Amino acid sequence: GGRSMEHYYSKESNPTDALKMPISAIANHVARLCGAGGVVTNVANACAAGTISIAYASDLIRAGKADVVVAGGADAFSSVPYSGFLSLHALDENSCSPFNHSHGITLGEGAGAVIVESYEHAQARGARIYCEVLGSGISGDAYHITAPRPDGEGQMSAIRAAIRHSGMTEVDIDYVNAHGTGTAKNDEAEFLSLHTIFDGKNEDLSVSSTKAMTGHCLGAAGAIEAVFAIKAMVEDTVPPTIGYREEDLQVLADKAGKLDFCPNVPRKKEIRAVMNNSFAFGGNNASIIFRKQPGEAKSAVSHVGGSIVVTGLGMVTPLGNGKENYLAACRENRTSDSVSSVGAPDYEKQNLKMAFYRKLDHLSQLQAVSGMDALRDGGYAVTEENAGRIGMIIGTSEGALGPSCDFQSMISQKGNAGGSAFKFPNTVYNAAGGYLSICSGIKGYNVTVTNGPQSGLQSVAYAMQVIRNGWEDAMIATGTDENSEIIAGLYRNLVLTTDESVHPYEGRDTFSLSDGSISILLETELSANARGAQPYCRVTGYGMAHRSVPFGTVAGSADGLANAIRAALDDADTTPDAIDAVIGFANGCRRVDQEETDALSRFFDLTVVPVITVKERTGEGRAASAALGVAHGALLLHGDRTTETDAYLKDGDMMRKTMVNAGGLRKILVVSYAAGGSYTAVILEK
């Protein structure tokens, strides 16, 4: 995306460049090339993205949601990160020197990928098995948007979780491929983490940073380094940390203690298990463990039974902010303009201080307000005791594309030396989640996903799986997108939007762009009962699927939605006959609306089963609209809207507006879409 932004702002505003800018283009193109029909998403956690992608792939397989997953990361060298790190004075004028001189990073580029597969599936097709993925750990620092916690707490939380989820102990790890960026703060925190966890427990641990050879490949780093770690294990060879001079070795010996940092030359050693660590802007930490011989260690991932419930709703919409304003707008049948806003009253209500929120870009402000609103609405107090037992999945369609384009536009005019250290941190997609972690104190699972509008529903599905795995008691799942001048301009250039008001099923060629941020607090029913929370509804099933079509289109992808619905029904152990209503994604653009009605008609008699749409009042808010569908459904099932609610029923070849009795609803299906053919379906129950 970065290279496309360069061309767009420095050469000509070509619409084809705009289509290549979103991170979601990457996974969609890969899915189309390899024919993937299951879960397709992009993990957008900056330098930890590749590692988290492999972890999520393994989770999906263990949950029975996939047999084979292509997982990895890619990043191309471009002006925005170069100028940004230059503005932070974080680039070493020489080659980077991790765990040595630590004067700064050297930027690299590349891609890494692994095929993650169930053992049974791999055996059945006679595949070569390199290793087993045992377990992973993911956490948030809740500290600073660019710097790690000096005490290494977040890093150690992720590392310990990976060891625990792998069913192993510290002594079982033979080699750690460290994050090792070559910056002083990162290297010092990682030194501390490794010593704290392994000293006195593992006397023969090898550690190295392969970034000394590749440079920092940013979003690709975790995946590339996972491949390094796996190959190290396969070949029983520890890759070196290069760049040490003779006079550096004594300093290293003093700092390393019994940890072997393998300076300058590789080391032959029997390696049975390896750990790969990745840490990122936003305070995101990820650790994953691979084992050479499958079956020698048992993964300790547990699957928690019982219901998952919605206990809090945070809402920032063009109709106003907070649940009360949204309900009032629904009762009064109000529509809105296309832009959400937050200001001093919102920050004060959520106890956000000016010293904090003035640092945030608009997208992150929307997310901070809605996230804190969900905690407030759910009566959930984050404390030191429970901060690690609650996490978040941030879903976004365009994410930080607006701030990134703004940064690129600035340096296209001023040159790479004209970048802003203040603005640069907001160009990573996981900035909004990082800021929410900081202001809320949440230190648990922290992942940002991006793949079109359905990201706001995919976040709910992902959060459900994290809770089912037993890794967190509670999760905030969000959908957040902004309608800035930059984003609106990109959509106009693609001839997808109009300034006119467009209603669902109008058969237009365009839609009305809007924005917002919706945060949904999910937790186990046991957790909710223990603290006396009053749930809105239960979330009983999810499904995700993909039917590849050219990125930027949806035409011909209805099979993907049908497969997602089928998977959600199976997951919830229910049937189409039990569904009382559907909250759909129609936005007035006939290409989108047709795929929805085509797939829904395969399961439901749409002359009887109503289709409700939140976009009637708020427009196409993308990920925000998808998450709003869940929030709206939760309010209906909870009884906050006991009177009639507007919906659509099929009348011949048309979908016509009508009213349905909200009080009679017991089970609701929520669906959403993405350009390229990705779909998510979630089932809510009273």
Model-based region annotation:
Residues 1, 158-170, 324-393, 400-401, ...:
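Conserved active-site "lid/cap" helical segment
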Residues 95-166, 175, 295-340, 495-574, ...:
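Condensing-enzyme catalytic core mediating Claisen C-C bond formation in acyl metabolism
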Residues 24-27, 53, 117-119, 151-167, ...:
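Short, well-ordered amphipathic alpha-helical segments that serve as non-catalytic structural scaffolds
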Residues 23-26, 34, 40-73, 106-127, ...:
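Active-site-proximal alpha-helical scaffold in enzymes
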Residues 65-103, 136-150, 178-188, 202-259, ...:
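Acyl-CoA/ACP chain-elongation machinery
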Residues 12-14, 25, 52-55, 59, ...:
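Glycine-/small-residue-rich "gating" segment that lines the acyl/pantetheine channel
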Residues 2-9, 15-56, 65, 81-83, ...:
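Conserved catalytic cysteine-centered active-site region
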Residues 166-172, 198-203, 255-311, 383-387, ...:
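Flexible, low-complexity linker/loop segments at domain and module junctions
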